[in-house]
Design a protein with these regions (language model features):
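Active-site loop/lid in soluble adenylation, ligation, and acyl-transfer enzymes
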Residues: 1-145, 258-286
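Coil-to-beta-strand transition motifs
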Residues: 18, 93-95, 195-199, 211-214
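Intrinsically disordered, low-complexity acidic/polar segments
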Residues: 30, 109-110, 211, 225-227
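Surface-exposed helix-capping loop/turn segments at secondary-structure junctions
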Residues: 57-63, 187-199, 212, 282-286
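Conserved metal-phosphate-binding beta-hairpin within the catalytic cores
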Residues: 100, 199-220
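Anionic ligand-binding catalytic core segments
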Residues: 114-117, 122-172, 216, 220-281
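A long amphipathic alpha-helix within ATP-dependent nucleotide-binding catalytic cores
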Residues: 166-200
Length: 286
């Protein structure tokens, strides 16, 4: 079988009335796929998504059918697909990346320093970098093709984008995406905080099922789609340590002549962070 779509990290296969999403061990930084692979990274992404999908079915249905390769065609019953593959319902994906920020960091912090706003939302004066916001904010963006950058947009603009594709439904879908995104974030951030992890921000993607219902798709609250910070070292006023590919990003910035290859030590540290986040949140080892 050949994938019908190959992203920087995931491969998607058509399985008739379902899709099979395979999370590889590839790692991308600054929109480039690095030459190294991070062992077990794909399994962390898939199993962590499963964990959150199971936890949040009371808020919104999701696209997951199974992560058991025995439920999938023969082609996937091999070690390289075991643990990192998910059979999913087919959805008509909505053209909005649903970003929610509970803390002021990253591009949001840069925008706030310049203007006092983040994606059209005015924030209180005097916030420090990495400070918790009074309430989580919803900052949607448009989905870019591979190689392009997503564009942050206002909530009002998200209504326009959705209305263009779904005449008469733009406002309804935009409100549903906003409300679901914030409800998911609040529930999961509260759970994570009890397990020693701050979810600073994250992104969700939604689609429509065959009956036109909004369904959560893609991945959910992984170190690739979220900023996870260790709660025990959290201190506003500067950037925070994180459970993701920050080691890789920092090394690449400090070594511009790198030919997109990481030293083994940086690969190992990155793997350790992914596994640690999974262990803290789920209580399980991989």
């Amino acid at each position: 079988m050949k994938p019908i779509k190959e992203g920087k990290v995931r491969e998607i296969y058509d399985n008739g009335d379902s899709l099979i999403m395979v999370a590889t061990d590839r790692i991308s930084c600054f929109d480039v796929i690095l030459r190294n692979k991070v062992d077990k990274k794909g399994t962390v992404l898939t199993q962590m998504s499963k964990f959150w999908f199971d936890m949040t079915r009371d808020i919104v249905p999701n696209h997951m059918i199974s992560v058991d390769v025995n439920d999938m065609p023969e082609f996937f019953r091999k070690p390289e697909f075991d643990g990192n593959s998910m059979m999913c319902r087919k959805l008509e994906m909505l053209p909005i990346e649903c970003i929610v920020r509970g803390y002021i960091t990253g591009s949001g912090w840069e925008s706030y320093q310049k203007t006092g706003f983040v994606c059209g939302i005015r924030l209180p004066e005097g916030l420090k970098e990495s400070e918790k916001l009074p309430e989580p904010i919803y900052t949607p963006s448009t989905k870019a093709e591979i190689g392009d950058h997503d564009e942050n947009i206002s909530y009002e603009k998200s209504i326009e984008v959705l209305e263009k594709q779904f005449p008469g439904k733009g406002e309804e879908y935009a409100k549903a995406l906003k409300d679901l995104t914030i409800a998911l974030y609040k529930k999961c951030a509260d759970y994570a905080a009890e397990h020693g992890i701050i979810i600073a921000d994250t992104k969700f993607e939604f689609g429509l099922d065959e009956e036109g219902r909004v369904v959560l798709g893609d991945e959910m609250l992984t170190p690739d789609s979220s900023r996870f910070w260790p709660a025990d070292s959290y201190e506003p006023g500067h950037s925070q340590a994180s459970f993701d590919k920050q080691f890789a990003r920092d090394w690449l910035k400090q070594n511009p002549d790198n030919d997109w290859t990481l030293p083994d030590e940086i690969v190992q540290k990155t793997q350790d962070k992914y596994l640690q986040a999974y262990r803290m949140l789920t209580g399980k080892e991989l």
